[in-house]
């Protein structure tokens, strides 16, 4: 079935209805919070948001107890991974009273182009891809730019390594060699047959990680393999499009035995970069960094200008053609106002 294209007025009307529904839900939650705070609440304590359900969240206390909590109306938007101050209620539902400062946050633009945090206090972003759906360097590079921009260490993860065969091995190897040459950590695993899963566990232990990647690459299957007994919905590739069907519906935080945490978030087909500038994109290509600022012209676009340090590095083989093509493709997809 063809995707329905909405007019601007239809999109505005849908957005307005959603905002009105959200406002009504927020008013109901505000009344619930007032009722709770008018009764008996426990002392303030710190906890971590491990799941978000719109107007309510699940919070885990220091002793491992999980409670559903209302949100005070004056709080900023909370996401999975946030550290908070909360008070337990005598009816089993508590109240979040404050958000603690974030060490890091991973953001992406929403449909209106406004930045929306999707995870907090993450120190490792695991970029998952697979032989099927076919991996594209441009999408991987977008995730790498987002990780570099957020100051979060990336880890490249090829899942479904058991699907590498004669038909795709050459292309997969060439893709992996690009990122190995750049020095990015990269692990090849299979959640299906257990290949290198112990190596992955070692890389995740002691970190707060988030898995990102297009749908169908097996993020939820990886969670099931890493944490047996965890109930996550797993989908397969669409038989019509060959793209992944979205399965996980809300970001959740899980604990690894070694002390690390995993935030499993909904799959997305393409990661937007509307929140970064041209300078941010350039800085996200790590092989560009020592060259930036050394072009003959200060406003060099690294296209055909004489004396361009990046073009000289491309000619000398210090920048790979695939990476330069990806850089140009990403810039071409950005609004001209960001240039």
Curated annotation (Swiss-Prot):
Superkingdom field: Bacteria
Cofactor note: Binds 1 zinc ion per subunit.
Family: Belongs to the TRAFAC class YlqF/YawG GTPase family. RsgA subfamily.
Residues reported in the UniProt entry to bind GTP: 159-162, 213-221
UniProt-listed NCBIfam families: PRK12288.1, ribosome small subunit-dependent GTPase A
CDD domains found in the cross-reference section: YjeQ_EngC
Record-linked InterPro entries: G_CP_dom, NA-bd_OB-fold, P-loop_NTPase, Ribosome_biogen_GTPase_RsgA, RsgA_GTPase_dom
EC class name: hydrolase
Molecular function GO terms recorded: GTP binding; GTPase activity; metal ion binding; rRNA binding
Cellular component terms (Gene Ontology): cytoplasm
Protein name: Small ribosomal subunit biogenesis GTPase RsgA
Localization of this protein: Cytoplasm
Organism: Pseudomonas aeruginosa (strain LESB58)
Family matches, as SUPFAM superfamilies: Nucleic acid-binding proteins (SSF50249), P-loop containing nucleoside triphosphate hydrolases (SSF52540)
């Amino acid at each position: 079935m063809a995707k329905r294209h909405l007019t601007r007025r239809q999109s505005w009307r849908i957005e307005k209805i959603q905002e009105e529904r959200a406002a009504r839900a927020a008013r109901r939650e505000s009344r619930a919070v007032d009722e709770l705070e008018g009764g008996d609440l426990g002392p303030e304590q710190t906890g971590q948001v491990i799941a978000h359900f719109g107007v309510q969240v699940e919070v885990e206390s220091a002793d491992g107890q999980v409670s559903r909590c209302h949100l005070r109306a004056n709080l900023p938007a909370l996401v999975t991974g946030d550290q908070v101050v909360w008070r337990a209620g005598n009816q089993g539902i508590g109240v979040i009273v404050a958000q603690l400062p974030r060490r890091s946050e991973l953001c992406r633009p929403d449909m209106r182009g406004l930045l929306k945090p999707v995870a907090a206090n993450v120190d490792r972003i695991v970029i998952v891809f697979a032989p099927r759906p076919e991996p594209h360097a441009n999408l991987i590079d977008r995730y790498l730019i987002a990780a570099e921009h957020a100051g979060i260490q990336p880890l490249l993860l090829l899942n479904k390594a058991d699907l590498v065969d004669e038909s795709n091995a050459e292309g997969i190897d060439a893709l992996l060699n690009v990122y190995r040459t750049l020095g990015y950590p990269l692990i090849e695993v299979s959640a299906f047959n257990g290949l290198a899963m112990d190596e992955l566990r070692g890389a995740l232990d002691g970190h707060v990680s988030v898995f990102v990647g297009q749908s169908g690459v097996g993020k939820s299957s990886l969670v099931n393999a890493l944490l047996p007994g965890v109930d996550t919905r797993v989908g397969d590739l669409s038989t019509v499009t060959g793209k992944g069907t979205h399965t996980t519906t809300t970001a959740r935080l899980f604990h690894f035995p070694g002390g690390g945490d995993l935030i499993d978030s909904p799959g997305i087909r393409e990661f937007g970069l509307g929140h970064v500038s041209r300078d941010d994109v350039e800085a996200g290509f790590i092989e560009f960094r020592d060259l930036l600022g050394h072009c003959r012209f200060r406003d060099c676009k690294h296209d055909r200008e004489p004396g361009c340090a990046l073009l000289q590095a491309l000619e000398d083989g210090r920048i790979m053609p695939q990476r330069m093509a990806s850089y140009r493709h990403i810039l071409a997809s950005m609004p001209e106002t960001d240039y």
